[in-house]
């Protein structure tokens, strides 16, 4: 706990200096359970589980079966308490407030044994007037109630009709009635995560004292005025006025780099607390706009806002302001029924390339700045430009959005409602209104957020009737849906933020959904809006099973994390694919079988006698399968951006499910818990490259498309090669040296019947050869070599067990792995166990005899440590 001038990291790591003191209560507290049998120190911000683990009272909650073993923690009622002395003279201040930025979730707050308020929503801040109860020495208690028990009680109180789903599927081993509490919906379990319905003070808590007035919030929105062809900034500030009299003053906004300074007179009263300003940017000053990654710079300008009020009060806020426009284009497409669905940033159509973000941990106090920055570096390194913040988790911390702004990562922001129906009692709706207002005001100044989405999959849940509600009752549920997402959430968003689009759900049909009364007849329509698509039964190498939709905001396949990640939370008896641990960790129904089903279509399952080797090989094959499946699907979406075929196409976004993991378990993630890259993430780095050749077959003809995110046409050379599996030396090459890849398009550059291709390369059959192809570009432009399999690899002939030798050397902070192979090696996987870092490439088809790969460590390591931990695997090693 410490005293400081008020410094709030509310927007863009901005600072706000106030004449009154701000005293942080973060730091060391005490926490005790319901019957008082446990009492221990606890850190705030933090969680009960974290405190128990830190003091050795429980193991790692993620170890083996501890999600079940420690269920008692979430069922108990815990109390956080602290005592503190006010380090300033209370008599000098008219008003004193106790402010919580986040309480998780249901608690009664006692200040000096006086109840000053209650909390029931994890997603909003709370402010309490303690002027009349604060003393020089004070006690503060938060008496938490079990979120599980609270949700059950709220559900039981809703007696008029059921609000499904009552409980999660049994595979998830979770708790019931999560839709009755405003808390991270995945905290009660999900099909990729555990049930840890935690309790704690998860964000900052502080005391603020002031005279005259206090700045409660401040937002700013740059808006481009088409009529005047100039930028304006809409600024809105809200004050708590302590004085009974009106308070006059001035506000000055300055942006030195844009030669902008504007001063306005203002007047505040207790009933008139809002200040609205329109700051006009000079037309003769060039404004550099903010661009998504890969399309330009993320230029921002330092802005100061100074409120000089009567009585000598000065409140200054410094922030970074970014200028950009966003449009969601829904209009007719020639040759296709329906409407387009794509985004324009600063007037330029942008293909969304990225993934879906889930909470990085069940316990947010573990998501440190370093950990967050490491995850974002992996996003950037994989050539992504978009993250969808999924609606079953949390509105992310301020640093998350600041990083998105700085790095050019667009954000598709869901509101936190997912895969469920929700009650619409007055109390629930009032809490949601506070939540939505709070979050929109907190986040709307971030240029990275390009769209608000009301929920995850709740429109389709009603349209398809996921929860088997009686058709006679469907109107009640539809009315509840419209009440919550349209009449409340949408109404608030449109009132608070007109700068970006809002859709009621994802997936949705956009404008078509509105026309159909907000529940579309077919939310999965590929002619409108966005879709979510999953298919675990059909062959994922067959691109024809995938929908040629306008934008695909979810799609994916599962895999297992690496053995080095699992080893930390398991014991030797767990190391088998069908062990009790493996079955327990799989929360998706039939998930383990579905992975093997896909693997068996194209690969041979391990047949070894060593159980541990078999387990490791199976893990490897699930990662190969996942990477190859999502490569095939993503490349289909990428090459569909510029074409309409049979009325389908104009795909302008591919966000695979999912980016990150919440714990160590099989999931759809490309990044394991702890940040290690799965094979899929290396594939994503390649298939999201700014210039990519994409190959596929249709009716016996082999095609190569050129897919470009570049802003200019690119003149290059395309080389197509055939290789025999037994030798890295290419059998033949076809070269076209006059290729033009169109800017921002996907176009056919090469086509040839496979039979003709094989004729030109004597000695090749579908089973004995593989195709590679690449653009010849300068070193500054990343354009990877791609490949196409002419048969399933389980049918490949001449595929030898490659002897791959490796020599490791060090150059500065980077390590060089020089590889040499005796034969073409599919899916070469370099692994250094638990040593944190990533390779420049991995999981690749090694078609050259020699290859150098770089390793970038995330922490200091040595050549000897790498040599000891290193292993290399290719496909034939699993036979």
Curated annotation (Swiss-Prot):
The domain of life for this entry's organism is: Eukaryota
User: What's the catalysed reaction?
Assistant: Hydrolysis of terminal, non-reducing beta-D-mannose residues in beta-D-mannosides
EC number assigned by the record: 3.2.1.25
List the pathway annotation: Glycan metabolism; N-glycan degradation
Residues folding into a coiled coil are none
Q: Where is the signal peptide?
A: 1-19
**Where are the disulfide bridges?**
167-176, 540-629, 732-761, 764-769
Q: Keywords, A to Z?
A: Disulfide bond, Glycoprotein, Glycosidase, Hydrolase, Lysosome, Signal
At which positions is substrate bound? 190-192, 456
pH sensitivity of activity = Optimum pH is 4.5.
Known glycosylation sites: 35, 77, 89, 113, 226, 297, 302, 736, 803, 807
Give a brief account of the tissues where this protein occurs: Highest level in liver, high levels in lung, testis, skin and spleen, moderate level in thymus. Activity found in plasma, kidney, liver, spleen, pancreas, brain, testis, epididymis, heart, lung and skeletal muscle.
Please provide an example of a Pfam family that matches this protein in its UniProt record.
Answer: Glyco_hydro_2_N2
One Gene Ontology MF term? hydrolase activity
The catalytic residues are: 457 (proton donor), 554 (nucleophile)
Looking up InterPro entries in the UniProt record yields:
Beta-gal/glucu_dom_sf, Beta-mannosidase-like_N2, Beta-mannosidase_GH2, Beta-mannosidase_Ig, Galactose-bd-like_sf, Glyco_hydro_2_cat, Glycoside_hydrolase_SF, Ig-like_fold
Q: What class of enzyme is it?
A: hydrolase
Q: Name one GO cellular component term.
A: lysosome
Q: Which family does it belong to?
A: Belongs to the glycosyl hydrolase 2 family.
Return the PANTHER family for the record: BETA-MANNOSIDASE
User: Which protein are we looking at?
Assistant: Beta-mannosidase
Which organism does this record belong to? Mus musculus (Mouse)
